[in-house]
Amino acid sequence: MEVDPQLRILLKPILEWLDDPRTEEVAINRPGEAFVRQAGAFLKFPLPVSYDDLEDIAILAGALRKQDVGPRNPLCATELPDGERLQICLPPTVPSGTVSLTIRRPSSRVSSLKEVSSRYDAPRWNQWKERKKRHDQHDEAILRYYDNGDLEAFLHACVVGRLTMLLCGPTGSGKTTMSKTLINAIPPQERLITIEDTLELVIPHENHVRLLYSKNGAGLGAVTAEHLLQASLRMRPDRILLGEIRDDAAWAYLSEVVSGHPGSISTIHGANPVQGFKKLFSLVKSSAQGASLEDRTLIDMLATAVDVIVPFRAHGDIYEVGEIWLAADARRRGETIGDLLNQQ
């Protein structure tokens, strides 16, 4: 692989991290700062690089794999000269003036099987039969908040417990306002990736990346919500937050949670949990991927993807939270989320 000397010069400010065997990831979300993951946690550091430097790194790194990176091709998964995996996101998939570079450093050492017990924490490796008991215990914990009637404590437990939440209601009902409140309750050390078609969410967390997709796949560098989801999975997120669910974003929403990233907070139009879930089912079913699935299969997938549906409506300048559907409550009543399709 022929490497442009300029690329190595541009990478010099981050080489001390890439050369450190403790480093797992280097996340550059915008000019001037980097988040370095070591020992399972990200730490923030100043980084003396400009927007132009980051853009040049992206273009030159893409060229290593003969990929043309720029406004018309703003997403790229490639490698750096020494084998580190790199996910590139340029405008217009990120806000103007920012560049997202996520560098995953490969392990320099291959351990033997004899070292597995010392390198991996696996206290439950042979306890598959206990999964239902643990699931029931998790349900009991959230149901205590639900049954006690303390709405603030319940919502906080949903957020920190990484339940996947769907907020539904008509336009102007307060669902987007509540989504901002709930996002603010996410532990501040988490790395968040948002996927939106317009910048509506407010993200107070330092380590975050705002990804933007084009409505109906139009515009320069047209990418879909699903394209951004695939990119975000290579960016070491703690949570992926999809804004409003509509059109092709519905399949991305389902794929996100099924891929092992619970704790999303998203909004959808629908007057109540029944209508909100029917809308989600219809949108997923209307996607190219969802159309090929049997209804039963799709319902089973959605059952694993949605933990809470919170409805909203407005009375003048007063917002009202309606009857919340909770998967744990449905399970103790012997119901599933699929039963919502048969309700009015």
Swiss-Prot record:
Matches recorded under NCBIfam families: PRK13851.1, VirB11
Broad class of where this protein is predominantly found: cytoplasm
Protein name: Protein VirB11
PANTHER family recorded: TWITCHING MOTILITY PROTEIN PILT (PTHR30486), TYPE IV PILUS RETRACTATION ATPASE PILT (PTHR30486:SF6)
Stored PROSITE patterns: T2SP_E
InterPro entries: P-loop_NTPase, T2SS/T4SS_dom, T4SS_GSP_E_ATPase, VirB11
Keywords: ATP-binding, Crown gall tumor, Cytoplasm, Nucleotide-binding, Phosphoprotein, Plasmid, Transport
Coiled-coil stretches: none
Encoding gene per record: virB11
Any single biological process term in GO: protein secretion by the type IV secretion system
Post-translational modification: Autophosphorylated.
Family in the record: Belongs to the GSP E family.
GO molecular function, one term: ATP binding
UniProt entry tagged with the keyword S-adenosyl-L-methionine: no
